[in-house]
Amino acid sequence: MSIRLAVLGDPLRYTRSPELHRAGCAALGLACESEALRTPVDALPATLERLAREGYAGCNLTMPLKEPALDCVARPSPAARRARSVNTITFSMETGVTLGDTTDGAGFLDLLAQEGRDPASVRVVLLGAGGSARSLALAIAERGGEPVRVVSRHEPEPGDAWGGALGERWSAWGSLAADRAVAQAQVLVNCTPLGNADLPQPRGGIAPDALVVDLPYGEAPSAWVTAARAAGLDAVDGLALLVHQARHSFRCWFDRDVPLEPLLAAVRRSP
């Protein structure tokens, strides 16, 4: 009998998660069926109920579902509650309880290690303040790293405990303070869906030794990643984080470790 997995989001045009699900399960000796299900926010509760009813083992979530998913799971992990974000859901067949977790932060720490950056000492600046950004920031804090700086279009809401705690570490998009933060970043992460024209440019605006990470991904490296590489910077797109967070998703679902190489190979094979 095949394991059934899915990825939910809207849009899902370039998702690679089904390939990663199948490759990870194959590495564990499990047959797997995985599908991409375009899911608007208002359809999320009913979709999760259907997947649980039909015997799915779990699913991954992408934008814009990570934050609303917190209210759709019976038992969110402590990390998911702190980040107010869920990207991995497990449907427990034994208890019938729907479990929610966020693996973005743990995957980000693995990505930094792969790129030779010490999470405990690197200066991270996040562009955006949504669920993914919170997951990354909290993971850095739990590793004992320097508190991250955040640049976003909107000031954190008064009731947002994480955003409110940023204080002077938050800067408004386009401000002089934001420009200074970006210029001092050792790791600069775009956690928004914005395109290249709206993002800080590599030549002159970003430190030459910085690592640039663009969380969105598509069929080819983004224009921002391409420009950063052309300027001589180390740069990776969201596929790198996707692979690392997928390994942690498998731990949530099966309590087993998946080797990194089969997942990387699956991404390389994908169109």
Which residues are covered by each model-predicted region?
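Rossmann-like adenosine-cofactor binding region
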Residues: 166-236
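Short helix-loop-beta connector
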Residues: 117-123, 207-208
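Adenosine-phosphate binding glycine-rich loop
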Residues: 215-271
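NAD(P)-binding Rossmann-fold cofactor-contacting core
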Residues: 145-166
